[in-house]
Amino acid sequence: MPRIIGIDIPAKKKLKISLTYIYGIGPALSKEIIARLQLNPEARAAELTEEEVGRLNALLQSDYVVEGDLRRRVQSDIKRLITIHAYRGQRHRLSLPVRGQRTKTNSRTRKGKRKTIAGKKK
């Protein structure tokens, strides 16, 4: 298993798929990185040489925000929205959907398990 920026990527999968195991790298960004380094996207990750792994590490650390840095940035953005009392921040704070979805029904993932309330008296 090659280790890239502290993450073990699957050795038996193709390079274009293996890179997507790094948080912040999807299929499109994976293709872009491979093209920039002129690597073979169909080659297996185990076939990478030490020099290629080094180039990959250097590129990811210098030009891209991935893994821990990206997670920290997302969390700090959410904290900032909460502290400035933005609408999106309030939705995050209340654990409700942020992007305008309906909440009368659905949104169980965000709200959590149903809280049973006593029915209306006749």
Swiss-Prot record:
Task: Give the span(s) annotated as Disordered.
Answer: 96-122
Q: What GO biological process terms are annotated to this protein in UniProt?
A: translation
Mitochondrion listed as a keyword: no
Instruction: Please name the GO terms that the record assigns under molecular function.
Output: rRNA binding; structural constituent of ribosome; tRNA binding
Q: Which PROSITE patterns match?
A: RIBOSOMAL_S13_1 (PS00646), RIBOSOMAL_S13_2 (PS50159)
- Keywords tagged on the record: Ribonucleoprotein, Ribosomal protein, RNA-binding, rRNA-binding, tRNA-binding
This entry carries the following GO cellular component terms, namely: cytosol; small ribosomal subunit
UniProt biased composition (Basic residues): 101-122
Task: Report disulfide bridges, numbered on this chain.
Answer: none
Which InterPro entries did the record assign?
Rbsml_uS13_C, Ribosomal_uS13, Ribosomal_uS13-like_H2TH, Ribosomal_uS13_bac-type, Ribosomal_uS13_CS
Quaternary structure and partners: Part of the 30S ribosomal subunit. Forms a loose heterodimer with protein S19. Forms two bridges to the 50S subunit in the 70S ribosome.
Family membership noted in the UniProt record: Belongs to the universal ribosomal protein uS13 family.
Instruction: Relate the protein's function as given in its record.
Output: Located at the top of the head of the 30S subunit, it contacts several helices of the 16S rRNA. In the 70S ribosome it contacts the 23S rRNA (bridge B1a) and protein L5 of the 50S subunit (bridge B1b), connecting the 2 subunits; these bridges are implicated in subunit movement. Contacts the tRNAs in the A and P-sites.
Q: What is this protein called?
A: Small ribosomal subunit protein uS13
